[in-house]
Amino acid sequence: MRYLFVVLFTLVLRIVHGQVNPEDVEIIRDSYGVPHIYGKTDADTAYGLAWAHAEDDFVTIQKAYLAGNGILSRWNGKQGVGADFIAQFIQSEHTVDRLYHTLSNEFIAVLQGYTEGLNSYAKHNPDEVLLSSLFPITPKKLLIYSQLQLFLSNEGDRFVEAIISDRVVPYKKPIEEDVRGSNLIALSSRKTGTNESFLAINTHQPLEGPTSWYEAHLVSEEGTNIIGATFPGAPCILTGANEYLGWTHTVNYPDKADVFQLEMKNKTTYIVDGEAHQLVKKKAKMYVRFFGMRIPVSKVFYESIYGPTLRNKAGVFAVRTPSTTNINALEQWWRMNKARSFSEFYSYLEWNALPGYNIGYADRNDTIFYISNGKIPKRDSSYDWRKVVPGDTKKTLWNSYYTTQELPQVIAPKSGYVYNANHSPFFSTAPDENPNPDEFAKAMNFETYNNNRSTRLFDLLSEKDTLTYEDFKRIKYDHSLPTPLNYNYVDFNAIFEMNPDDYPDVADLLMDIQNWDRVASADSYGAGAFAVLYYTLGKYYFKLGPSKVFNKLLIYTCLKDAKKHLLKHFKTTSIRLGDFQKLVRGEKE
């Protein structure tokens, strides 16, 4: 990638105290506004990253830290209550205090540099501070926030919300969730036919908020030279490339969180293997606003040997996820930033601190690699871990984890390619080199499905023996759906078998979709019709049988809903995708 460097400013600030000397930090922004940050030490570059990111989006960083430290509702009232409760429910502060000694001194210096950068920015820009009690930000506050993010990434919050709502298993909303997804592709010289390896980093994150990407380039005299992206509040790059290698992530969905129903003897005593245990009562404190006044509210939860615990009308339930068992994920990412070879990179994966995420990798030595990574518990196979499991026996109380070597992975395949699109790790390269699902415990519950994107990716990657860089870019920017459609959660293909003459009141809409070339281009009328139709499916999804097949009659109902929506909002049944789906930033679209 070619950069045109335009020096907008050089940062020189002076502070009396602290580990970092700001005179050793230089921030140069290129023509896109991306900060290129130079420092003598990694702590220097972390300081510069914090300052640059704060210049661009200090509000989001603060809101993230407020939520992670359980005080967001002090600033925004009831909107922050949910995040504050979960942050206190998982007791991150206690976890960080207990495990802080497991961090290296080198990484603690990075954390100190980053938090010094935020504190210095706040000191020089007091009008931008949302809540003064958040400051000074410390390395521990940073880590406490990261614990919340990782718990959310393991979908632990869904179980908490379900239990509070007097359910146990969270509702799945695949129609809505399928609009989110990421893709990774890595090609070695076996596939490129040249002395080159290609890596596509195509993660899809929100444009705003605590999980929106922030691009940066970090350089230090301690061996760091990496460009990539990070989340607000993180002190290092989370996906990117250095001079030697690059990696990216997509979200994976093995079983990363469990719910246990406790056997209660009375309101405060539960029984495990015939032995009585006492629930430890805890209280989360949040705030709401009433006529401008900040009113404290509280919610009781408990601690059991299974983890943080809640009571609802159905019983007492504990939520347990590996993300809360260590605080080393950020240091693992930081070490990955500095890796110079596949063996070194893999050795950091063996820390087993990241609770999840697929990883796609390529390096200058022509090694490509894929792994469905995660801290996956070793569970008793006699239980169905997709459901609530009994919390009355230590047979279900897992405390050990599969090693990195025991996870589904592909290293340097003969096919010359690996890929993932939030689908099964058992379809990650050529068919004869895929991981064998029979070699992995069913209780790990790895995905076994393909989806539209993975189906299309495989078709494109396997259609030619070698792929040029132009081919690679064409695949990366491909907007086509496969034939037949391959949604992993529903079969909608009956729409292409419907005779428009049999449905005259929606014939125009049906023909637009049936004549569509499956390319989701902004100017496509077929794509526009299909997109509107797609968003009508959600309310009917839970009416489907186990096969999850939309029959013609139900599709007809959805088509009528789509037509009604189009006429109401667009005054026509024929619109382009770009009329319905737009990227809007301020006054630009």
Where are the regions that the model predicts?
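Bacterial Sec-dependent N-terminal signal peptides
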Residues: M1-V20
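Substrate-recognition/specificity elements adjacent to catalytic centers across diverse enzyme folds
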Residues: V20-G223, I227-C236, P322
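Short alpha-helical segments and helix-capping/turn motifs at coil-helix boundaries
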Residues: S104-N105, G117, Y121, R180-A186, ...
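Acidic, low-complexity N-terminal propeptides/linkers enriched in Ser/Thr/Asp/Gly that mediate export
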Residues: F107-A200, Q205-L207, R364-I368, I376, ...
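Glycine- and hydrophobic-rich flexible loops that cap the catalytic core of alpha/beta enzyme folds
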Residues: S220-E221, G228-F231, G240-Y244, H249-V388
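Proteins synthesized as precursors that undergo proteolytic processing into mature forms
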Residues: E331-Y357, R364, P437-F492
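Hydrophobic alpha-helical segments
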Residues: L354-K464, L537
